Curated annotation (Swiss-Prot):
Signal peptide: none annotated. Keywords: Capsid protein, Host cytoplasm, Host nucleus, Late protein, Virion. Expressed late in infection. It is found in: Virion; Host cytoplasm; Host nucleus. Belongs to the baculoviridae p24 family. One of its GO terms (cellular component) is viral capsid. This is Capsid protein p24. InterPro entries: Baculo_p24 (IPR007765).
Length: 198
């Protein structure tokens, strides 16, 4: 168990989400060789979706060489984090946000510095860009459909069908008129016959 670093070490805070600042210790052994440790309670919180038997097991199950105690705080080495991420089922398409946070933490601890500093407005900007992109696509699709409708008159087949329907309607109206006239004439004849019989 490491109680103090034999090389250069410093405690830093890495930002990964709007409400979480994670305390880390970076030990620089030589140029390009770093050992990164994450504070235990932060590690347990980030890894909670991957833990089956609770957060206390993180410290208990860590190898002695993966433990660091500094300023009365417990830290776990980046290799100890790998163990939990390696057990995650990658076939699960709906991944918790902690999955991505843990991957970023592991990457940053291996490099010895935070690679991509969290921008609190980044997610909002990304969502606004996605909304704007969707709106632009919808507008362009509507414009294409509108231009197609204005530029393309109805197809000749549709015009022929419309003429046929109008002809059939006209013919039907004539037949109805003829039938109605015939019925009225027959009624008049029946009435006349009835009047004559009286």
């Amino acid at each position: 168990m490491n109680t103090d670093a034999q090389s250069t070490s410093n405690t830093r805070n890495f930002m990964y989400s709007p409400d979480s600042s994670l305390e880390v210790v970076i030990i620089t052994n030589s140029d390009g060789d770093h050992d990164g440790y994450l504070e235990l309670t932060a590690a347990a919180k980030v890894m909670s979706p991957f833990l089956s038997n609770g957060s206390s097991a993180v410290w208990t199950n860590a190898a002695p060489s993966h433990k660091l105690i500094k300023n009365n705080k417990n830290y776990i080495h980046v290799f100890g984090l790998f163990k939990y991420l390696s057990n995650y089922n990658l076939n699960n398409k709906k991944r918790p946000k902690e999955y991505y946070t843990l991957k970023s933490i592991i990457s940053d601890l291996l490099m010895g510095a935070q690679g991509k500093v969290f921008d609190p407005l980044c997610e909002v900007k990304t969502q606004l860009c996605a909304i704007q992109e969707s709106l632009n696509e919808a507008i362009s699709i509507l414009n294409v459909h509108s231009n197609d409708a204005a530029a393309n008159p109805p197809a000749p087949d549709i015009n022929k069908l419309q003429e046929l329907i109008q002809d059939l309607q006209s013919e039907y109206n004539k037949k109805i008129t003829f039938t109605t006239d015939t019925i009225l004439e027959n009624l008049k004849n029946i009435k006349d016959l009835m009047c004559l019989n009286k």
